[in-house]
């Protein structure tokens, strides 16, 4: 059943666990995520970026999620707009049936971010929809939005306190050192957990970790064995994800891991049987690989058996 994002995250906030927020761009990804949620008895945060919506069509994206909710009526599901860049894109998502939206104005100055976020919150709350915002700037590329290392900024906890109080945003993504994509760290992985804990103490709302894909060893190996190139890639270590939850993270965004796992299996089939053109032969193992990544992440973050 479709529910407000806050219905899922406030429970996680109160009980101290994390919920994976999984991106999708087609039916195969969506089906695998729902199957994982069903098998692990976990609530679901389903995400679509502006780019994914452009690719699928917003009505198709919402329609597929609603059909899957009918198939699995016992699973609480939030449908979330990931990295909405304008008021208009958030409003369009709300009108289309999304139950949670993110307004990402982190590239603006603090006051402009606060003003735009407050405007989105008012609109969305009037429609019964939850809102996420971001403070600080993450390095990396997300849906063709690029932030260089020199422009990445960690969150200021005091600003976060004021931002949450004045905007009335439901959950906040503080920049604590992660980055988008498969190349998250140049040296040893490092996240500012003390900063995270201070943000949690001052805001006392659900917090979100962006750029949280781990690139697990088995997923990396499958991709490399199939001829893929991930030279220099580094994900967020599993122990960092667990430590971030202890520090107050309740929503953990995961996209890159899903893409890598899925494409690895597609490459494998293509390499092993060059005469194969039955799409089901490609997508069935790809869905299984993606489902297994999601299931393991649910157990790691603590959302398994939380329905």
From Swiss-Prot:
Family label: Belongs to the class II fructose-bisphosphate aldolase family.
Entry-linked InterPro entries: Aldolase_TIM, Class_II_FBP_aldolase, FBA_II, Fruc_bis_ald_class-2
Residues at which D-glyceraldehyde 3-phosphate binds: 49
Protein's GO biological process: fructose 1,6-bisphosphate metabolic process; glycolytic process
One Pfam family of this chain: F_bP_aldolase
GO molecular function annotations of the record: fructose-bisphosphate aldolase activity; zinc ion binding
UniProt-listed NCBIfam families: cbbA, fruc_bis_ald, PRK05835.1
Cofactors required: Zn(2+)
Active-site positions on this chain: 82 (proton donor)
Binding-site residues, Zn(2+) 1: 83, 180, 210
The EC number(s) this enzyme carries: 4.1.2.13
Keywords (A to Z) from UniProt: Glycolysis, Lyase, Metal-binding, Zinc
Role this protein plays: Catalyzes the aldol condensation of dihydroxyacetone phosphate (DHAP or glycerone-phosphate) with glyceraldehyde 3-phosphate (G3P) to form fructose 1,6-bisphosphate (FBP) in gluconeogenesis and the reverse reaction in glycolysis.
Name of protein: Fructose-bisphosphate aldolase
Residues binding dihydroxyacetone phosphate: 181, 211-213, 253-256
Residues annotated as binding Zn(2+) 2: 104, 134
Catalysis performed (reactions): beta-D-fructose 1,6-bisphosphate = D-glyceraldehyde 3-phosphate + dihydroxyacetone phosphate
Entry note: cofactor: Binds 2 Zn(2+) ions per subunit. One is catalytic and the other provides a structural contribution.
Organism name: Helicobacter pylori (strain J99 / ATCC 700824) (Campylobacter pylori J99)
